[in-house]
Amino acid sequence: MQHSIVEYLSEHEGYRCGYCGSPDSNFSHGMWAHNLTCQDYQDLIDRGWRRSGKYVYKPTMDKMCCPQYTIRCHAPSLKVKKSQKKVLKKATKFFTTGEKPGGEGGVQHDGEDAPGGVHPMPPSHQELPQMPMEDISKIQGGVQESEGGARVAKGQSDVEGQSDVKGQLDVRVPSEHGGLEGKRAGTSGESPATVSIEKQKRIPKPGLGADPTKPPCKKSKLLRLEKRQERLKQKANTESSEANIRPSNSSKTENSPKSLEEFIVDAIPGQDPKHQLEIKLIRTNPPSQEYINTEKESHKVYEKYQTFVHNDPPDECALFEYKRFLVDSPLVEQYSDDGPECGYGSFHQHYVLDGKIIAVGVIDILPTCVSSVYFYYDPEYRHLTLGTFSALRELAFTRLLNVTAPSLEYYYMGFYVHSCRKMRYKGQFYPSYLLCPEAYIFQPIEDCLPRLDVNKYSRFASEDESDAAVSLEEVLVLHKHIAMPYPVYKQYRPQAADEEEVKEYAQMAGKKCVGQMLLYRN
């Protein structure tokens, strides 16, 4: 089992706000994520966290100048509005005729209101976390659990030197006598030497190969594909049966609103397009070969965008900064039998026009959503209103994934800032929901806006709904390569004056996450 590993960086305060321009009124709490499972990150963004590279931050909503509310849209239920149809039709006309709309060259939803929104840059090298790189390399395999999933072990009680096996961690719990009890997670109590000998006995001799009496084992990718095809077949049969028994209603069909997909067309019917747009999905962590092949080109687009739209100096747009901000990711590449074929994790979507990258959408594909991280484009194509256009295309992509992964049904647009005029367009995607900053429950945006018109910071949930309390006993930490509950860690480091910091981390990360993620302690 893989575990997320994070370092809590506490509160960062007094930095510049990217929305109102105030130099010192932005506040947030942060974590450095060495690695995150996609489920843990899903749980974090459902508590108001977002990532920028490997830096994960949570705005301090009641203190900051421009409160940032997590916003999501239920993609399968999307109702396309007139203004959004206009954006798609304008793009189709351009692809068909090649003509740019007159007088609209400067009108654009730029990167500050593009789906992902404005992010703080990851901490500089002076602020980087303290976890040694050799520790990270030893724990990439994650925590292994014993049978039944219990994090327990027996035997040695000395913390020093217990986890010298690469890719494996001990998981310790308090014994009845107050010490550490447990065996190496995932073993049955034998000594390492005994286990090694037993494993060697099971290894077939060279040259013998697989058992010819048994069929060859199928690869997990093939098994996932077969299960997905079976689900699609069953769904098609169900829809066919429903169609046979459903009474025809031609007038209703004619009057029913068009779906999003019906507005996304490559060219006006009956005309040959002047331009061809292709959207490519490219995994960035671990970097795929296609990402490596296109890294320089996509970085050049980013450089043009940042200098033109945000007036950033060229040295702040260097390849190193670009990768730290939009390529580096803590998300672990994961696959599931009932998930999308592309898997979960971090990706780029390249908008390729006539073989040339004109825009890039940075997205995370998570168990229940597609999360927009950032979007940038070549300013030459700003007339296409690419902020709204990209959001609609990412919504269409979410709807496509939902066909084979029913639990993946939401599109997260980053943050909604009611005080920022350029952000208002996010609320136009219906149905959309804002996250209550106190109860962490999503509420329909139409119920929230009247409250925000009165107060920029507002609770949306009813008073009888509250966030679950978290105790320090529930917090898992990583110390000396060993995962253990926080009270056990305190037995070994009673002098550590970090209790208030860990309490704050637990409250910010929430009950579900602190029992799954490992908080690094040096």
Show where each model-derived region lies.
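C-terminal catalytic domain of photolyase/cryptochrome flavoproteins
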Residues: Q349, T404-N522
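A conserved beta-strand-loop-helix scaffold within acyl/acetyltransferase catalytic domains
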Residues: S4, S52-C66, I71-L78, Q84-H383, ...
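Terminal, non-catalytic protein-protein interaction segments that mediate quaternary/complex assembly
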Residues: E11, P23-N26, N35-L36, G53, ...
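Aromatic (often tryptophan-rich) hydrophobic motifs at membrane interfaces
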Residues: Q349-Y433
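Eukaryote-specific detector of the first structured module of a protein
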Residues: G18, H34-T37, D46-R47, R51
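Intrinsically disordered, low-complexity N-terminal segments that are enriched in acidic
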Residues: Y15, F27, Q39-D43, M64-C73
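Intrinsically disordered, low-structural-confidence terminal and linker regions
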Residues: M1-Y19
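A residue-level signal for conserved active-site and pocket-lining positions in enzyme catalytic cores
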Residues: L44, Y302, K426
